[in-house]
């Protein structure tokens, strides 16, 4: 804003003193207009000479002054020099206003569109003529160079003879048509005349007569057709260099006669000119061969040097006028470089196509497009880098929050709404084949199933460790994690079936269809599905399970302790085994009698329970017990044999010995309670949140599985004998015969349906005691099984108790008793069956492990071998 105010002030001041500016003195005008001053000589570039008043010229200068004032600072530096009026339009020019400039040497009036230029003025009055005396005829006495190129002149300037010091005259690029006799008369100091690119068609032969110092005449690109005047000029001035290219020469036969008169050198020149005229027929065309020759119109070298150079060139033959002119131009350029730099030349003054200054000015323009692209790319990279640097911490923070919010076991969690809650069942689960749990979901087996679908038995030690760690919790080195305890509590609180959550090895059912299906089956639906299935197909599987349970229960010490040899054996055989497949045989005794009664009612021929009891004797019951003990005795040798081979033998033997009368006689519909009987009440689930002793009375009979049998009194006596033998040994080891003996002790007499309700009340305490001692896990893969009984009087061995292997397709043998059936109910979680009621009541009992063999199995290895051979 401050600069703006200053400029306004200067503008107002200049307008106020317009009078002063319009009438400057001579001295001030001369000092304002000079462009350069060198060695005391004043060099003035007067381009405002016109036939107008001095006031108009002064106003033009004042306008230029104010225009420079209001331009930006960057443009002011360009206009520090005096104005260059090379492009102003001037119609007529005279040198009278410049007559007082005695020191003027160079006058450049190019590109002014001048139509007329004259130095001849009418004589002043006599008084004025007397005042100036002899100086009246002398105008611009020191002017040496006059440049009038690129104008509209139709003829040579008039009165050139008055310029006594003129050495170079440039009239190129005009419209000159004719050169007369007196055009250059009296210019005795003239050395070079440039008439290039005009329309000259005729030249007077004596036009250059008397110009003894004339060295260069450029007549290129004109309309000349004949060489007669040129030859005349050349003869008069033998040292003269002529530029005759690009003319319309007519090389006819008449010129041949003229060539015979001239010398050989002129003949060669004539031939060269004729050849060039044939190639270039356009009269006004320019060539680049003598483009540099125009630089020679300002010469500072002495005339003697130029004469010697021209004479040496003139002696050569037709080496051509163009060659002489180009060489002369090079020499003159070196000597005249200082003089040429004394005044600025506009790029328009040299209008030919090869102007170097115009080319250099174009090259100086900055590449705006390339610069913009480079800047945009650089800015893009910088912005991207800044965004990445600032956004990286926020991205890392969001990723950490996402990882922290994600639960570690969410990927391996196994959730099923059929169970009670989400169970992380697949945390360490290794699927080696088709799981036994999966087979019970699709258990629609028939008698003609392939016997190769055999369940491989598991080593016996894993069930013992799982039960001890899952229910006892007294081992300080094997404490349950909070997640496992929570899953155990949730599984016990309802009737849901819990998959093992620890490292479990599953039974692989080879070739069983629909083995990969995972479905949620409720306990009621599971119970009904078992009634629709053929129970003959799973006897071999129950053999392996019972054998494994009995073997582990025999070596399990009280309060969860067991020998180190068994611990090592458990580690060698298998790292982990399922806890919910151990008690499948114990559940086979509940459904059979009920289904028998249902089948009788459906067929219309009900069989009384008394008749069923009459078919069974006490001897047969003992045979069943002895058969189980024999299987427990044969466990060591049974484990050494291939699982598939042993089960195939058992399958074939049982399949061929099954009597047709023992096959199921009920339909395939859902389970329906007989009309003559009352529905049996379900036991309540066991609640592990309370103490075992305090919860003893309030615990439901969920895990107590009742079966219908007529041999309750005899089985009660065998149970009392086995408990007495265990107490005499001073241990609190649980009886392993709960799967057969205890459940048969708790069986009510089925003489009538009304006796079932009355008999359940006194048997509830015994069932709860057995439930606390020996409740086994029953998963969703529990199935209806029947026991294979044989005649053997040996008692159950506490050490050799194991789970009986289950074989699909197995049928009831003729040794089995009709009344001994097991009913397996889905139970929540395994309750520690290693304790008896006496252990809970008297905690000070000795907890030393029981001897590996009981008194009933001290007969020796021969008897056991005999029993094994008898069984197989």
Curated annotation (Swiss-Prot):
Biased composition (Basic and acidic residues): 349-363, 484-493, 831-841
Gene Ontology CC entries for this record: membrane
Gene3D superfamilies: Ribonuclease Inhibitor (3.80.10.10)
Record membrane topology: Multi-pass membrane protein
Record field: transmembrane: 4-24, 371-391
Residues carrying a glycan: 45, 108, 472
Alphabetized UniProt keyword annotations: Glycoprotein, Leucine-rich repeat, Membrane, Phosphoprotein, Repeat, Transmembrane, Transmembrane helix
Main location: membrane
Phosphoprotein found in the keyword field: yes
Annotated region (Disordered), positions in chain: 339-363, 467-501, 560-579, 695-761, 776-872
InterPro entries: Leu-rich_rpt, Leu-rich_rpt_typical-subtyp, LRR_dom_sf, LRR_TM_domain-containing
Subcellular location: Membrane
UniProt modified residues of type Phosphoserine: 718, 752
SUPFAM superfamilies linked: L domain-like
Regions of compositional bias (Polar residues) in chain numbering: 467-483, 725-736, 746-760, 785-805
LRR repeats, residue ranges: 142-164, 165-186, 189-210, 213-234, 239-259
PANTHER family associated with the record: ANTIGEN BSP, PUTATIVE-RELATED, INSULIN LIKE GROWTH FACTOR BINDING PROTEIN ACID LABILE SUBUNIT
Protein's name in the database: Leucine-rich repeat-containing protein 66
Lineage: Eukaryota, Metazoa, Chordata, Craniata, Vertebrata
GN (gene name): Lrrc66
């Amino acid at each position: 804003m401050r600069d703006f105010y200053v400029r306004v002030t200067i503008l107002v001041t200049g307008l106020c003193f317009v009078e002063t500016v319009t009438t400057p003195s001579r001295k001030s005008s001369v000092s304002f207009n000079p462009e350069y001053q060198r060695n005391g000589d004043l060099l003035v570039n007067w381009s405002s000479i016109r036939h107008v008043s001095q006031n108009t010229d002064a106003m033009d200068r004042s306008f230029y002054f104010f225009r420079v004032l209001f331009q930006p600072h960057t443009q002011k530096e360009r206009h520090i020099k005096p104005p260059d009026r090379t492009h102003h339009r001037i119609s007529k020019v005279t040198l009278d206003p410049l007559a007082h400039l005695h020191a003027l040497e160079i006058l450049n009036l190019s590109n002014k569109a001048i139509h007329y230029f004259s130095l001849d003025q009418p004589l002043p009055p006599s008084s004025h003529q007397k005042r100036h005396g002899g100086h009246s005829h002398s105008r611009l006495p020191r002017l040496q160079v006059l440049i009038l190129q690129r104008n509209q002149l139709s003829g040579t300037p008039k009165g050139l003879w008055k310029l006594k010091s003129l050495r170079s005259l440039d009239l190129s690029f005009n419209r000159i048509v004719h050169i007369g006799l007196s055009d250059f008369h009296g210019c005795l100091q003239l050395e070079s005349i440039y008439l290039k690119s005009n329309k000259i068609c005729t030249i007077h032969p004596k036009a250059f007569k008397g110009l003894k110092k004339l060295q260069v005449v450029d007549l290129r690109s004109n309309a000349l057709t004949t060489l007669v005047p040129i030859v005349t000029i050349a003869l008069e001035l033998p040292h003269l260099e002529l530029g005759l290219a690009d003319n319309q020469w007519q090389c006819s036969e008449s010129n041949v006669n003229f060539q015979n008169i001239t010398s050989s050198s002129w003949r060669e020149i004539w031939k060269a000119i004729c050849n060039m005229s044939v190639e270039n027929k356009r009269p006004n065309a320019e060539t680049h061969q003598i483009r540099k020759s125009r630089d020679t119109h300002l010469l500072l070298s002495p005339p003697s040097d130029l004469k010697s150079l021209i004479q040496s060139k003139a002696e050569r033959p037709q080496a051509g006028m163009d060659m002489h002119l180009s060489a002369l131009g090079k020499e003159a350029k070196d000597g005249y470089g200082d003089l040429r730099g004394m005044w600025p030349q506009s790029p328009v003054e040299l209008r030919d196509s090869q102007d170097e200054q115009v080319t250099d000015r174009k090259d100086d323009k900055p590449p705006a497009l390339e610069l913009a692209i480079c800047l945009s790319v650089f800015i893009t990279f910088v912005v991207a880098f800044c965004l990445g640097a600032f956004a990286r911490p926020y991205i890392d923070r969001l990723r950490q929050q996402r990882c922290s919010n994600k639960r570690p076991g969410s990927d391996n969690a196994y959730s099923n709404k059929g169970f009670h809650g989400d169970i992380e069942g697949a945390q360490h689960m290794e699927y080696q084949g088709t799981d036994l749990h999966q087979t019970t979901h699709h258990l629609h087996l028939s008698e003609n199933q392939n016997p190769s679908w055999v369940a491989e038995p598991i080593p016996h030690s894993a069930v013992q460790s799982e039960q001890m760690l899952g229910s006892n919790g007294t081992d300080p080195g094997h404490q349950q994690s909070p997640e496992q305890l929570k899953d155990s509590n949730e599984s016990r609180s309802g009737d849901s079936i819990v998959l093992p959550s620890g490292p479990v090895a599953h039974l692989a059912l080879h070739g069983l269809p629909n083995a990969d299906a995972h479905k949620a089956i409720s306990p009621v639906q599971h119970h009904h599905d078992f009634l629709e299935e053929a129970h003959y197909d799973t006897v071999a599987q129950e053999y392996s399970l019972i054998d494994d349970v009995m073997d582990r229960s025999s070596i399990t010490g009280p309060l969860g302790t067991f020998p180190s040899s068994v611990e090592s054996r458990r580690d060698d055989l298998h790292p982990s085994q399922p806890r919910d497949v151990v008690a499948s045989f114990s559940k086979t005794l509940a459904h059979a009698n009920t289904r028998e009664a249902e089948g009788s009612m459906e067929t219309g021929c009900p069989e009384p329970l008394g008749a069923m009891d009459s078919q069974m004797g006490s001897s047969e019951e003992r045979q069943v017990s002895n058969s189980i003990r024999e299987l427990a005795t044969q466990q060591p040798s049974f484990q050494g044999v291939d699982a598939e081979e042993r089960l195939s033998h058992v399958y074939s033997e049982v399949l061929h010995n099954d009597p047709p009368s023992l096959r199921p006689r009920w339909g395939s519909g859902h389970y329906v309670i007989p009309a003559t009987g009352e529905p049996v009440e379900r036991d309540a689930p066991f609640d592990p949140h309370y103490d075992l002793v305090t919860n003893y009375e309030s615990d439901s009979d969920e895990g107590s599985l009742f079966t219908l049998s007529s041999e309750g009194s005899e089985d009660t006596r065998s149970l009392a004998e086995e408990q007495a033998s265990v107490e005499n040994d001073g241990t609190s080891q649980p009886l392993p015969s709960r799967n057969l003996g205890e459940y048969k002790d708790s069986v009510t007499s089925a003489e009538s349906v009304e006796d079932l309700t009355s008999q359940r009340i006194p048997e509830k305490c015994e069932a709860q005691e057995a439930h606390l001692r020996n409740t086994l896990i029953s998963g969703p893969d529990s199935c209806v099984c029947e026991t294979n009984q044989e005649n053997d009087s040996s008692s159950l061995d506490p050490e050799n108790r194991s789970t009986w292997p289950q074989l699909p397709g197995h049928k009831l043998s003729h040794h089995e008793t009709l009344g001994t059936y097991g009913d397996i109910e889905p139970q929540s979680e395994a309750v520690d069956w290693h304790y008896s009621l006496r252990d809970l009541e008297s905690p000070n009992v000795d907890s030393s492990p029981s001897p590996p063999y009981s008194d009933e199995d001290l007969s020796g290895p021969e008897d056991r071998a005999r029993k094994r051979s008898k069984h197989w």
